[in-house]
Amino acid sequence: MMIIVSSIIAVLMAVAVMVVRIKSSDKPVSPKKIILPPIFMSTGALMFLFPVFWVTGAEFLEAFTLGVIFSIFLIKTSKFEIKNNEIYMKRSKAFVFILVGLLVIRIVMKSILSTSIDYGALSGMFWILAFGMIVPWRIAMYLSYRKLHNELQSSNIQMN
């Protein structure tokens, strides 16, 4: 039952991310908007204060490594563009498909792993996977943003 509930919540969160992503492409990006999500998500690590969520070293490495691998797809579909002297996220149709694909993979993995791994530890592993995915993605976004921001600044200086 918990697997079904958590899968429904994951679907709702994915839909929310897609809506936010589409709406945010209409507004300029700032470093704060890139950096804050992983910081906010890091508070979820407090779950590991409770033994029910503890994972082994191998489970941690597996989950984190898989998250880093998944982040590559997000990094490849997150591009910026300059419009009206401001930096915006480019809309990407591939991003939606990748997000849905990652969600399907997550649900399938959770269904399979829930038969052999305790639900609390599995929840911890999926948090680690998500954190391992969002941190490299946001670091890559920030570096890309800084590069574009510096180009924008130097072109503004040359114009003056």
From Swiss-Prot:
- Predominant location: membrane
Q: Does the keyword Transmembrane helix apply?
A: yes
Subcellular localization, as worded in the UniProt entry: Cell membrane
Query: GO CC: one term?
Result: plasma membrane
Segments passing through the bilayer: 2-22, 34-54, 55-75, 94-114, 117-137
Record-linked Pfam families: DUF1453 (PF07301)
Give a yes or no for keyword Cell membrane in this entry.
Answer: yes
Q: Tell me which UniProt keywords the record has, alphabetically.
A: Cell membrane, Membrane, Transmembrane, Transmembrane helix
How this chain sits in the membrane, per its record, is: Multi-pass membrane protein
PANTHER family, sorted? PROTEIN CCDC
Q: What is this protein called?
A: Protein CcdC
- Species of origin reads Bacillus subtilis (strain 168)
